[in-house]
Amino acid sequence: DISFIEALREWGCDPDAYRDAVIAPGSYKCFAELHIEQGKVLEQTQHQLGIVHNIAAPTRFKIHIKGVADHSGATPMGMRRDALVSAAKLILAVNEAAETEKANGSVGTVGVVDVEPGSINVVPGAVTLWVDVRGVDKSSIERVLQSIREQAENVAVCDGVGVQLEMLTADSPVALDKALAAQSEAICAEKGFSFLHMNSGAGHDA
């Protein structure tokens, strides 16, 4: 293995001169990024190209659920504080919160579930959910987050477990240049490409 700096030098680059790579203001008119969709909207609607108007921003956080780890055979159902059962309710809560805002382009995903102690004969004592909420409308994103917070409080009270939200990142959506979008539409029409006005759920550099 080699470091990134070593790789740059191997390719003939000078890592110490990285500041010289900054493009000077006024030396460019615009940026346009061509990218695969990373989704299925264009495929399912049978359009060749998408003209993007907004880039969604992710808000990422963990939900920590603290229950009690007990023997799975010796602990009656009514005496359990199963962190994974509570976590399952919160996974559904994330999905339902995003569903209510889907018309505004918001989505919610629980992509990772960490369960402790992770044994088949032990009632889960602790669970961490890794959550990704994103959208193009800040107020819609906030409504999703507020719904999740409220459900987290309800689950904590009803199930007798500890629930804590740990914020990781919270970025802001970006609106793209309308004139450039209009120019892209004109080019598509001129060349005979079918196109769809849409938002980008994935982040992009341009």
What is the meaning of each model-derived region?
Residues V157-M167:
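Conserved short beta-strand edge segments in small beta-sheet-based binding/regulatory domains
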Residues V122, S140-V144, L196-M198:
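Extended hydrophobic-aromatic, low-complexity segments
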Residues E166-A206:
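An extended, acidic, His-containing surface patch that forms the Zn2+-binding/catalytic region
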Residues V112, V133-G135, L145, M167-T169, ...:
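Active-site proximal loops enriched in glycine and acidic residues that flank catalytic Cys/His/Asp
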Residues Q48, R149, A179-A182:
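Charged helix-capping and loop-helix junction motifs
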Residues D1-S139:
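Midchain, well-structured core segments that form catalytic/ion-binding scaffolds
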Residues R143-E153:
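Short amphipathic alpha-helices in soluble, non-transmembrane regions
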